[in-house]
Amino acid sequence: MTRETRFGALAADARWQKAWEAANSFATTDSGQKPKAYILEMFPYPSGRIHMGHVRNYAMGDVLARFKRMTGHDVLHPMGWDAFGMPAENAAMEKGVHPGGWTRANIDAMRAQLKRLGLAIDWSRELATCEPDYYGQEQALFLDLHAAGLVYRKESYVNWDPVDMTVLANEQVIDGRGWRSGALVEKKKLSQWFLKITDFADELLEGLGSLDKWPDKVRLMQENWIGKSQGLEFSFKFAGGAPAFAVFTTRPDTLYGASFAAISPDHPLAEKLAKDSPELAAFIAECRRQGTSAEQLETAEKLGFDTGLAVEHPLDPDWHLPVWVVNYVLMDYGTGAIFGCPAHDQRDLDFAHKYELPVHRVIADGDETAQHFTGSEAYTGPGKLVNSHFLDGMSIDEAKAAVITRAEHEGWGKGTTVWRLRDWGVSRQRYWGTPIPFIHCAACGTVPVPKSQLPVTLPDDVDFSVPGNPLDRHPTWKHVACPICEGAALRETDTLDTFVDSSWYFLRFASAPTDKPFDPEVIRRWLPVDQYIGGIEHAILHLLYARFWTRALNKLGMIDIEEPFASLFTQGMVTHETYSRPQGEGLPPLYFTPDEVERGADGATLIADGAPVEVGRVIKMSKSKKNVVDPDAILDQYGADAVRWFMLSDSPPERDLPWSEAGIEGAWRFVQRLWRLFGETENVGDGGEDKGLARKLHQTIAGVAADIEALGFNKAVAKIHALANEIEKAKPSATRAEACAKLILLVAPMMPHLAEEAWTALPASQRTTPMVADAAWPAADPALLIDDEVTIAIQMAGKLRDTMTVAKGADKAALEAAALARPRIVELLGGAAPKKVIVVPDRLVNILP
């Protein structure tokens, strides 16, 4: 074929993507003889357009998947769509489209965009969680978990999003607001379905220790969320001796610092008292309109209601503590009741200051032992016990143990463990989700849908003209016969939290299309996922739920593994500076897209009027700030390989990547440099073997392989740049021609279209396979991985003056003679003999003139 002088990226992209598809190049192989590599990026929500964060995420996974194919692995690298969720319903309400049609159109658009990147994906494994063949199997698994006692239904206070009109899990409440709508979350009592994740709290916590290929930060986040706390549980008595309520504390050492007792607004005692107190009832109602997360309550103003009741201090019955209902105690942690120790807990201190309650110091780090504590910040550090009777002089740990021992001996309390983790509420009052497969019968109660009647599919004829769940209002869908008595009954109209959908999709991918949720034998071959890639924002939600789901299925005997993801990588975000103008006092800035702005050395101006705009800081790309870059536009301009190269090259993959025109331009120029180099594979010239270049080539082969294995893509890119530089400087030789040909294979995982084009142009004798997609990674010669030459620094009076390359291990006399013969050193000495020469073999020669 005639070779173009410039690489035509767009034509090559289209040509090779078509060729790979025709050859089924990336179909999953399962020889049973090769090691397996299951590479998976977190599947996307089909919003309609991919963004640069997607591009970076999938480029990383693709490089690893292609590399694993080249190194002799059976590779599973699938793609699918996390396709249920509220945005589709919002589109239905705003645009009058059906959620299913909107979602499937978005999937088609995003699939086409992803294919433009040249991803080595087995598209035959594609799935969408909104299709009955997926969610029907999810319903079957849900019934299996129910049969095993891991699913239950109860009435409880839930996090209610008043805008989206649905329930949120605790993990979906961020700073007291719904994670999607941003609305302040309220508390509401509803009948809900729960998964018993708390049954697995201990093993989920202990299992983190085996995940040595997960980021420490993610493991710590999960550990804190599971929240194992050991402490004392005891029961207060009302003044007079009648039982009052139980309390759990992790700080029994501070009992002598107590100045009040507090209960949650949702505590049974608070609700009982509210029946006879309109003021307390109003206070409780106000608390429930506030946020529900621990984070929001931490920062909110501390409010309380004095019940007028008092309880006896457990260590001194004559010491009475007032009982308050407070807004910062959660019913779903511990017992929903505490004792307040203001001197050593900031929330209690803020509350005590507001309501003028006593503040008693019981821990001191130094000489300050006065009982009355006057500081504005609670002391939470180490120290010894003071003002605490029999505990005085003990360390905190000693005092904790002493109080628990006394409580157990006297029978008023016991040492116990509680968990921050709560059971997973999975009910959602939405249409676009997996229908929960249960039926409510007046005679038989709540009964499961028989598996023979699965899937329970969503009706298409739904009305989104008013907020709420359209399934509740559907005239026929929810009316069914009871599967037990055949009498009139109602379907469950709640749907499952979409995080259920993503808790097992990796199992379905491995099994390909099947009439079961998955094939246990296939799962035994492919799971766990060898490399999982996605954002750290999923550390608690998705990743914890997937771990629970895997362990639950293991408990049911359906799979052998306990952990779904052997190795986890959390990539950084793609960021961009913002461009804006102020709109006036009290108004948000007016933002502009990068296409609307001309960037110069002194700032930026709006193209439309030439006037300046404010250049903001570099932040995550977002539609609201308009600092997004359209991948399609960049692909149209530079082609897939330049985009992939830039995504991999400019920053360590775990860090954020600032988008820049200079960066993508540099990637494009390097693509063209390589294209020119690849045209010189037959130019052997008159030169013989180039040992230095051969060594550089084989060191690069080994180094790039190690970097890709470790997901150090930027390091691999740097090594390839360095090798290209050496090849360009080298004289024509057989070694140089070989290096050019091997370089094609080294860049193939990152620049697959360029590599295919260059591979095809090679002489047939140099090609081991018709396409580079099927080629093997080049072998590095171990003998060439060790340098037999070193670069020596030559100093004069300690200052660097020259360098020289010499044989490794050269003796001191040879190094001194070589250094003194260097033209630069001869010039600097001016014919004079040096006073002294200090030689450090293989490192430096220091000449003292």
Curated annotation (Swiss-Prot):
Motif ('HIGH' region): 44-54
Molecular function as annotated in GO: aminoacyl-tRNA deacylase activity; ATP binding; leucine-tRNA ligase activity
Pfam family name, one: Anticodon_1
InterPro entries: aa-tRNA-synth_I_CS, aa-tRNA-synth_Ia, Leu-tRNA-ligase, Leu_tRNA-synth_edit, M/V/L/I-tRNA-synth_anticd-bd, Methionyl/Leucyl_tRNA_Synth, Rossmann-like_a/b/a_fold, tRNAsynth_Ia_anticodon-bd
Keyword Lipid metabolism: no
Ligase listed as a keyword: yes
Major site of localization recorded for this protein: cytoplasm
Catalysed reaction equations from the record: tRNA(Leu) + L-leucine + ATP = L-leucyl-tRNA(Leu) + AMP + diphosphate
Alphabetically ordered keywords of this record: Aminoacyl-tRNA synthetase, ATP-binding, Cytoplasm, Ligase, Nucleotide-binding, Protein biosynthesis
BP-aspect Gene Ontology terms: leucyl-tRNA aminoacylation
Localization per record: Cytoplasm
Family label: Belongs to the class-I aminoacyl-tRNA synthetase family.
Protein name (Swiss-Prot/TrEMBL): Leucine--tRNA ligase
